[in-house]
Amino acid sequence: TYFRENGFNIHKRSQVLGIITRSSKGLCVAGTHGKTTTSTMAAHLLHQSHVGCTAFLGGISKNYGTNLLLSATSPYTVIEADEFDRSFHWLSPWMSVITATDPDHLDIYGTKEAYLESFRHYTTLIQPGGALILHKGLEMQADVQPGVTTYTYSRNEGDFHAENIRIGNGEIFIDFVAPDTRINDIQLGVPVSINIENGVAAMALAHLSGATDEEIKQGMASFRGVDRRFDFKLKNDRIVFLSDYAHHP
């Protein structure tokens, strides 16, 4: 009330992020689940590379102890694009990942069809010259503008995918395959199986934004995860204790 009475403009967070994406190259991660880890991973890959980025994340990065990263020089802004209340419709992405479209927030959307329509509309907001990186096999129909390139990704197939997956002794190594490169023997800093797929999406964003193969490889190995996202608090031969948000529709 004080701010309104004194002439301040008040905006929702999503509206402010929309303003930011109109004045920078927004790298957005949308989807029912996986978006916090994927966006935080992508932000780390870019932040530790020569490309750099600003980032507004939906969780606390364990690498940086914050959900906000700032760069005075990078044109890129990594944003977790939240579909709740259709808030991601305020954004103007340069590139976007869509991780999943399992129906959620039906108190807002009412039906599965309305939920999927919201994602279709979101894809129309991606700016010409940019890209959509769509999880292979989703029910939704993309509707991108002319000049937007659409890629697919998943763990095992798509334009971006993983091969030669090796899991053992608490470690995961993969080869990352992209349309124009292959990065072998990448170690996942957080050796959780779902992070193979999250990592493919994050590496796709970083690669398309100009990070080098070596920067991507080093960044994946040094990624420490997100607070309360499969967060190991205790791990020994007898006990594994995890803290996790544990939200899935």
Residue ranges and their predicted role:
Residues 2-136, 140-149, 200, 206-207:
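Phosphate-binding loop of NTP-binding sites
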Residues 109-116, 146-249:
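Adenine nucleotide phosphate-binding catalytic loops in nucleotide-utilizing enzymes
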